[in-house]
Swiss-Prot record:
CDD domains: enolase (cd03313). The gene is eno. This is Enolase. It is an enzyme of class 4 (lyase). Its main location: cytoplasm. It catalyses: (2R)-2-phosphoglycerate = phosphoenolpyruvate + H2O. Mg(2+) binds at D244, E283, D310. It comes from Chlamydia trachomatis serovar D (strain ATCC VR-885 / DSM 19411 / UW-3/Cx). It comes from the Bacteria. Pathway: Carbohydrate degradation; glycolysis; pyruvate from D-glyceraldehyde 3-phosphate: step 4/5. GO terms for biological process: glycolytic process. PROSITE patterns: ENOLASE. Its cofactor is Mg(2+). Belongs to the enolase family. The keyword Transcription does not apply.
Amino acid sequence: MFDVVISDIEAREILDSRGYPTLCVKVITNTGTFGEACVPSGASTGIKEALELRDKDPKRYQGKGVLQAISNVEKVLMPALQGFSVFDQITADAIMIDADGTPNKEKLGANAILGVSLALAKAAANTLQRPLYRYLGGSFSHVLPCPMMNLINGGMHATNGLQFQEFMIRPISAPSLTEAVRMGAEVFNALKKILQNRQLATGVGDEGGFAPNLASNAEALDLLLTAIETAGFTPREDISLALDCAASSFYNTQDKTYDGKSYADQVGILAELCEHYPIDSIEDGLAEEDFEGWKLLSETLGDRVQLVGDDLFVTNSALIAEGIAQGLANAVLIKPNQIGTLTETAEAIRLATIQGYATILSHRSGETEDTTIADLAVAFNTGQIKTGSLSRSERIAKYNRLMAIEEEMGPEALFQDSNPFSKA
């Protein structure tokens, strides 16, 4: 068993949920076992994320092809890894990082490297005939995460004029992951009927949430409260609200304002929303470059609301350490494709957890049927996950995988929300 090595690595171009190309990578061992992984892609991206390599050939997919990334997998990474143990994830990831040789993986592409990294872990798990979460986390991995369900899409994930990007619900009173999914689905369908009755659009955005034309962020939150109550649940007690402001998308870097408002105004807006609505989590409430704004937000709300850094940290351990030292945020969003390897993803989770920051495993707006992040959330006991709404198969696939894991674990499974400010 211990001489199972990488014999081949294949990559192919597939489409993500937005109809853009991405990679599917297959790592094959000398025993015939293999693992496959598909790489997601973001629309709202942090400026310090690892680079997603695109061909920039206007004759194919408006320049978004990934043939060069595929070539890098097969002609650079495969020869570099061929013959190495399928179980030595850390060494394999280090070899790929060295082969790239750039701080943001711009030479070979984080999409190429991540595809190999995740497929390698799956190949190892399949070789041992273990589920991925158990292979990576061992016997101590038993926490099923509380989902953040994106029911109304705005910002860069829709074309409806809403300033904030995600308006989410968190089923905090659920006794299990399966019940949390049921609660979310019932609120989702209640919201759909409410929108229909008000003659509002029920088309969905990139992450499966509805994207109606609304006048304000508050109107979106009011709709969520109505849907929660219509579905038979009590806001705050059963289901809380969460926001992803994606504030960098409406931040003016020249005059350092948010749609003409100062960072103090932006913090005031968020504080007022938290007074009027059962919000217990806010992601990217300030722009990634606005450290003064983040400091004020953390001082103002950090003792009663989960403040999640996404663009602020981009799953980068160095940036997380810097933010912790400055007292910015109190939670970290974890997106494997922001950093580019499984090893670095695990390091980011470990660092945040040691420092008392909550972690949330997250999808991207451009997703595939790949369910790896569900296993990662359980493997690393993150206690929270963001994987979209209760529609679109690329989102539902992750929920279905989590429910399967919960059933497989039986009484060992523990549904646990890692948000310390949860009202449940």
